[in-house]
Structure formats: C-alpha cells, structure tokens
C-alpha cells in the first residue's frame, strides 16, 4: 500500500467490492483501496480439503473469507433475474435493476464466463411449473449462467490481476472501525491501529462480516431492520432424482408455504452432481454445497431453508441462527448427517446405518447423528413438508436413503437503512452486498457494487 489517503475505501473483496472497484477504475483519476480480511484468491486454501481431515477452525475461514468472498468456491451461479438473489428493486426501478444485471453479466463474460445459459426452454419449464403448482410449490423461473467452482475462481483471479494494475489491494487486513466526523465518513481504522483516510467509505463485508457491520451501524445510529432468519439443512439425493429439473433450469428455485405454520420454505443453492462442504464462521461450523464443471459426483445437493420473521422484542436473528448451528457442533463436533429414514423412525443415524443408504455421503467428515436434537420442531416439520411436496415433481427426493446435513444457516439477517443509491444516513458511507442484507447472490451483489460506484462517480463529476 503506497498511501494513507484515498478517494474511495472499499471494505471487503467479495463481488460487491470487486464490481465497485471495476466500475470506479473506468475513471483514471480515482484512487481506490480494497481492504480484505482474508487471503488473495491464489492463497485461499481450506486445510480440511488439502489435508483430508476435519475442520481446522481457521480464522478467518478460507471458504467464506478472502478475495471473491463467500461465493469464490461456490459453483458460481449467476441468476439473471430481478426476482432472485436480492432486493435491489426496493431501491431502484425493476427495469433499471434488470439493465444493471445484464451489464454485470457482460462483465463476467468479458472475464471468461461460459456463454451457455440455463432456463431458456420455456415449454419444459411451463410443464414443470404446472406440476409444481399441483404440488403446492411455486417454481420461480430464472435464467442461470453457471460458472462452476473452477471457472468462478479463475474469473476472480483475472479480476484481481486486472485491478492490481489500477488500484491498491490489501489482504489479511481486518477493519476494526469506520471513522466518522460530523456525520460524515472520513476513513477506517484496522485492528492493528492503522488509520487510513478516505473521501468515501464503502462497507461490503459479505455474510461473514454482517454482524460486524451491524455493530458499526448501531454505533452510528443507522436504523437496522431484520431480514428473515433462514435455517435448514443441506439435502443430498441421487443426481438422477433431480435430473429432469436440473437439466431444464439447473437450479430449481422452489417456494412452499407449510400447512401447519404457514412458514415460507425454499430451496437454495442447488448443486447438480456436486458435493457437500463444511464452512466455518466465528467458531461455528455449518454446511454448504459446491459443484464443479470438470469434477462430477453421482449426487445432487441443495439447501432447504425455513424463513422466520421475528417481531419485537427479539432483535438478534443472527445470534439465533448461530445458536442452532452451535447445537449441531456440540453434538457432533461439526456437521451432522442423518438418513431421512432414520429421522422418520426417531433414531439417530450411525456409520453402519449410513452404509445401507444408496446415497454415498460426499462430506466424509460429517458425523452421523440425529437432527431432531438440533432443529426446532417448527423448522424440522417445515423441511419434511417441503421434501414431501418436492417428491411429487422429483420422485426419489422423499426417500429413506436421502441424506440430511445440518445445519445450514444464512447470516444475512440485518438490513441497513439505505437510500436509493445505497448510501447510509452517514454522509459518504455506502453499504451493499450480502453483508448489508440487501442481496443474496453473486449477480445482485455485483450489481449493488455498480450502483454505489456510479453514484460516487456522479458526485465527483458534479464537483468538477
């Protein structure tokens, strides 16, 4: 790092931060610094994978922190729809969101994204949509560009190499505090006490930094609203059971409202021919899924998440989600895996019982156990209702052999009060991406970064 003062300081090198920087570099006279608490993309390594052991509890977790953010090692799905992956249409016109999503997608293509797009077979999708409706499921059609984990990291590396020639990037640097004077952002202080001044500060810490951002917002008296808490399991089935759906739309976005509690349940992050993985955040192990273009398994995995909207006086949805994940850690030392058949019989899965399953677990480190000791009844019953409904359009999903991994929790629960240009009530302090609670995926997070950058450039041009 060459200087102590910048035009723009970006906190977080996930898609929101990266695309903010990419847009800002279109003007040669803007000095930009990206600060990232994790490693650069080439050095991000999960020891659990490289050493074939259990989770090493690295801090920060290489799976969710570092250049590229939590999505760097995902299977890289770009949902090219305004209805999926965020709430940007709450801030700007939906047509404008669609235009910016197309713009962001074009940038991914420039850096090497695959040109193939799923979800274009309208006739087949309409048939599936009708069948889903009869099963009391809502299929949300969306066009998806699938990068694959290998291609996703390759694209992120190209973006990093490009930006290194344009801006300053500092990895392994955790921000302690956003500095404010007279209700105006003026810079940041790192955990090592280094103070860096900036005319604009952009907070994009991702899911891993959502709690930190909430704490900062509270200090600055920025209003916070709670998003629903999403808690559930990662489901693993034979790939053939989901093949019809994944061939047509790649990722089936299905929504269901439970009969018993009227809770919203949804599928999330479907990974055809993928593998289940552990991710680690703030001392807690949870579960996720990846899929690769080159390396395929015989299974498909996806999350089933139950959304809960808490009301007054409860204000700690993130703590609630972490508490449930921590219960699984206490019982198993990490992630629990259970056959659906064992859950129905009211018994735990054992290593021996898992050998009777036709589904071979892809997360070898998961401990056979009993999820009914972890998940609240309301959440567990919602998951089972959802799987029964899905079985009507994908026979084989609700099978005694189906594997359930727990738990999966999404930590994007606090939504900051933002203007239409994603600025907080603190002047020149912007927030965007998953960490700010306004996006939930790669493409809308990327788009949110473009919105912020365009506003900063507009203000700079106005001052000239």
Label every PLM stretch briefly.
Residues 2-85, 123-464:
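Residues forming the flavin
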Residues 66-118:
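Dinucleotide-binding Rossmann-like beta1-alpha1 core, especially the glycine-rich loop
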């Amino acid at each position: 790092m060459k200087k102590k003062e910048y035009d723009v300081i970006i906190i977080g090198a996930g898609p929101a931060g990266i695309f903010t920087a990419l847009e800002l570099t279109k003007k040669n006279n803007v000095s930009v610094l990206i600060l990232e608490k994790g490693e650069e993309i080439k050095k991000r390594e999960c020891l659990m994978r490289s050493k074939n052991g259990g989770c090493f509890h690295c801090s920060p977790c290489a799976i969710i922190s570092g250049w590229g953010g939590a999505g760097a090692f995902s299977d890289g799905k770009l949902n090219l729809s305004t209805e999926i992956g965020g709430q940007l249409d709450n801030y700007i016109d939906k047509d404008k969101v669609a235009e910016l999503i197309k713009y962001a997608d074009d940038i991914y293509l420039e850096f090497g994204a695959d040109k193939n797009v799923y979800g274009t077979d309208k006739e087949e999708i309409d048939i599936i949509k009708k069948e889903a409706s009869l099963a009391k499921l809502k299929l949300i059609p969306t066009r998806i560009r699938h990068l694959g984990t290998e291609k996703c990291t390759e694209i992120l590396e190209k973006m990093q190499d490009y930006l290194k020639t344009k801006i300053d990037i500092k990895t392994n640097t955790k921000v302690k505090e956003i500095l404010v004077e007279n209700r105006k952002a003026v810079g940041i202080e790192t955990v090592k006490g280094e103070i860096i001044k900036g005319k604009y500060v952009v907070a994009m810490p991702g899911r891993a930094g959502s709690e930190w951002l909430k704490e900062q917002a509270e200090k600055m008296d920025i209003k916070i609203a709670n998003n629903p808490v999403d808690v559930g399991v990662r489901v693993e089935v034979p790939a053939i059971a989901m093949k019809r759906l994944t061939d047509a739309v790649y990722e089936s976005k299905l929504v269901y409202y439970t009969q018993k509690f009227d809770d919203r349940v949804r599928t999330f992050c479907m990974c055809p021919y993928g593998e289940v993985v552990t991710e680690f955040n703030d001392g807690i192990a949870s579960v996720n899924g990846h899929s690769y273009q080159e390396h395929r398994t015989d299974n498909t995995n996806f999350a089933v998440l139950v959304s809960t909207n808490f009301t007054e006086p409860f204000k700690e949805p993130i703590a609630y989600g972490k508490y449930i994940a921590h219960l699984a850690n206490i019982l198993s030392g990490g992630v629990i895996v259970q056959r659906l058949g064992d859950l129905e019989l009211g018994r735990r899965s054992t290593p021996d019982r898992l050998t009777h399953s036709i589904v071979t677990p892809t997360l070898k480190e998961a401990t056979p156990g009993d999820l009914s000791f972890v998940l609240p009844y309301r959440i567990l019953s919602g998951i089972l209702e959802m799987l029964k409904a899905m079985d009507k359009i994908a026979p084989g999903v609700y099978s005694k052999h189906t594997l359930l991994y727990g738990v999966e929790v999404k930590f994007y629960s606090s939504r900051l009060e933002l203007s239409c240009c994603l600025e907080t009530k603190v002047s020149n302090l912007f927030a965007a991406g998953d960490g700010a609670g306004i996006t939930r995926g790669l493409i809308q997070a990327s788009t949110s970064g473009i919105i912020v950058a365009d506003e900063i450039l507009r203000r700079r041009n106005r001052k000239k």
